[in-house]
Swiss-Prot record:
GO terms of biological process kind: 'de novo' NAD biosynthetic process from L-tryptophan; female pregnancy; inflammatory response; kynurenic acid biosynthetic process; L-tryptophan catabolic process; L-tryptophan catabolic process to kynurenine; multicellular organismal response to stress; negative regulation of interleukin-10 production
A cellular component term, taken from the record's GO annotations: cytosol
E.C. designation(s): 1.13.11.52
UniProt region (Disordered), positions on chain: 360-381
PANTHER family cross-referenced by the UniProt entry: INDOLEAMINE 2,3-DIOXYGENASE, INDOLEAMINE 2,3-DIOXYGENASE 1
Gene: IDO1
Source organism: Homo sapiens (Human)
Cofactors: heme b
Induction cue: By IFNG/IFN-gamma in most cells. Exogenous inflammatory stimuli induce the expression of IDO1 in antigen-presenting cells such as dendritic cells, macrophages and B-cells.
Activity-regulation annotation: Activity is inhibited by and MTH-trp (methylthiohydantoin-DL-tryptophan), modestly inhibited by L-1MT (1-methyl-L-tryptophan) but not D-1MT (1-methyl-D-tryptophan).
Identification of the protein by name: Indoleamine 2,3-dioxygenase 1
């Protein structure tokens, strides 16, 4: 595999990383060829179809469509997003515990075929609902919350626009830091101390800005709506009591399959900076390490390859340690501290949007029928607080200077 940083010290196009939006899909396609109008109609009208109880019947009446008319990457990504949203809506219904355990063949077959082609599991992942689910309202204006919208949501008032777009804007803010990565490796190769120092401080600054963007979640996402509505539609069927064996993809696999729901663990951004800084999140074989390793299977293959390629580059941490240079150590630590701050903030968000609403549920609602059985779990199926605390702790332990 080619190194992420080839001799030109740019990030190779094969990794699908955009200069402006990073791991997000730049300018996603908004419409599929007319051949797929029936899919698009359902996806565009999910809130009405779910509310009226017609969604499942509409899905069951669909004709089986070939994926052969999806000829380019952007149309394939849009079709995956469309089929993923329809699948989540079909499985979880109105979100009150009436669950479907079999995905009809007319949707399961094209969805699985397309997923196989894109090397992603047939479930709605972060790369679908966040990275490919957006548009600019005015193409000539900047990428701000006010000038953006999502392509699809599940229910009216589910805060999906806020949740997906703020997540996307954090990704976009971090894209500025990704651009600096080639400079880091070039500076190490050329032994240019000042260039490396400046690059590390630039990465830290970009990650600090990403944290500021994260604050927007309070303006656009309501904890009750997230907990009781959106969270359910993002839940998967791995380790989920409601689909204890997984989901049957009729006509494609005979046995049910288990897949994790979409989660921030599927974002390549934070894994990318862990790898760059030599923070050993996936070492040690603990639950958190295993989960993060598993989540790579839920990332687009180009991004998985980028992470692998980064891992094969020389270690920034070892280089900084070998120099015995206080300035470099401080710059390295500034990057680590920025990641620690982001992870601490994520813990606060989980407390506000999951733990507190879970504790406020009326007792009669706390049944095993909660679709994501999630009291303290994330949509990816992890015990969320313990997982995030482990990840933050591993990050903190990577600081070169105590305190």
């Amino acid at each position: 595999m080619a190194h992420a940083m080839e001799n030109s010290w740019t990030i190779s196009k094969e990794y699908h990383i955009d200069e402006e939006v990073g791991f997000a899909l730049p300018n996603p396609q908004e419409n599929l060829p007319d051949f797929y109008n029936d899919w698009m109609f359902i996806a565009k009208h999910l809130p009405d179809l779910i509310e009226s109880g017609q969604l499942r019947e509409r899905v069951e009446k669909l004709n089986m469509l070939s994926i052969d008319h999806l000829t380019d990457h952007k149309s394939q990504r849009l079709a995956r997003l469309v089929l993923g949203c329809i699948t989540m809506a079909y499985v979880w219904g109105k979100g009150h515990g009436d669950v479907r355990k079999v995905l009809p063949r007319n949707i399961a077959v094209p969805y699985c075929q397309l997923s196989k082609k894109l090397e992603l599991p047939p479930i709605l992942v972060y790369a679908d609902c966040v990275l490919a689910n957006w548009k600019k309202k005015d193409p000539n204006k900047p990428l701000t919350y006010e000038n953006m919208d999502v392509l699809f949501s599940f229910r009216d008032g589910d805060c999906s626009k806020g949740f997906f777009l703020v997540s996307l804007l954090v990704e976009i803010a971090a894209a500025s830091a990704i651009k600096v990565i080639p400079t880091v490796f070039k500076a190490m190769q050329m032994q240019e101390r000042d260039t490396l120092l400046k690059a590390l401080l630039e990465i830290a600054s970009c990650l600090e800005k990403a944290l500021q963007v994260f604050h927007q979640i309070h303006d656009h996402v309501n904890p009750k709506a997230f907990f009781s509505v959106l969270r359910i539609y993002l839940s998967g069927w791995k380790g989920n009591p409601q689909l204890s064996d997984g989901l049957v993809y009729e006509g494609f696999w005979e046995d049910p399959k288990e897949f994790a729901g979409g989660s921030a663990g599927q974002s390549s951004v934070f894994q990318c900076f862990d790898v760059l800084l030599g923070i050993q999140q996936t070492a040690g074989g603990g639950h958190a390490a295993q989960f993060l390793q598993d989540m790579r299977r839920y990332m687009p293959p180009a991004h998985r390859n980028f992470l692998c390629s980064l891992e094969s580059n020389p270690s920034v941490r070892e280089f900084v340690l070998s120099k015995g240079d206080a300035g470099l150590r401080e710059a390295y630590d500034a990057c680590v501290k920025a990641l620690v701050s982001l992870r601490s903030y994520h813990l606060q968000i989980v407390t506000k949007y999951i733990l507190i609403p879970a504790s406020q549920q009326p007792k009669e609602n706390k049944t095993s029928e909660d679709p994501s059985k999630l009291e303290a779990k994330g949509t990816g199926g992890t015990d969320l607080m313990n997982f995030l605390k482990t990840v933050r702790s591993t990050t903190e332990k990577s600081l070169l200077k105590e305190g």
